[in-house]
Structure formats: structure tokens, C-alpha cells
Amino acid sequence: GLIRPSKRCIGGGDPCEFHRPYTCCSGYCIVFVCA
């Protein structure tokens, strides 16, 4: 899977700013789940 760090976010399951299954991980929004 491709991991693309995006806008910074706060851990806790923030929706970030995507309608796709992005997850907040290590302070960044990544695709799907944290590796």
C-alpha cells in the first residue's frame, strides 16, 4: 500500500479532511490504517 502523509492532525480518529478511509497516524493523515 502507498502511504501518503497529508495535513497534520490530532490522534484520536479525526476525519482529517478526506471523504476516503484516511486515518490520523503519527500526527498525519494516512491512507487506510497505521502500519
Swiss-Prot record:
Which portions of this protein are annotated as coiled-coil regions?
none
- Which ranges of residues are annotated as propeptide in this record? 1-8
* One Gene Ontology cellular component annotation held by this UniProt entry: extracellular region
Location within or outside the cell: Secreted
- Answer yes or no on keyword Disulfide bond: yes
Q: Could you tell me the superkingdom of the organism this chain comes from? A: Eukaryota
Keywords associated with the record: Cleavage on pair of basic residues, Disulfide bond, Ion channel impairing toxin, Knottin, Neurotoxin, Secreted, Toxin
What is the annotated tissue distribution of the protein whose record heads this document?
Expressed by the venom duct.
Q: Which GO terms describe its molecular function?
A: ion channel regulator activity; toxin activity
Q: Provide the primary localization.
A: secreted
Q: List the disulfide bonds.
A: 9-25, 16-29, 24-34
Family that this chain belongs to: Belongs to the conotoxin O1 superfamily.
Its annotated function is as follows: Probable neurotoxin with unknown target. Possibly targets ion channels.
Entry remark concerning the domains of this protein = The presence of a 'disulfide through disulfide knot' structurally defines this protein as a knottin. The cysteine framework is VI/VII (C-C-CC-C-C).
Record-given protein name: Conotoxin Cal6.1f
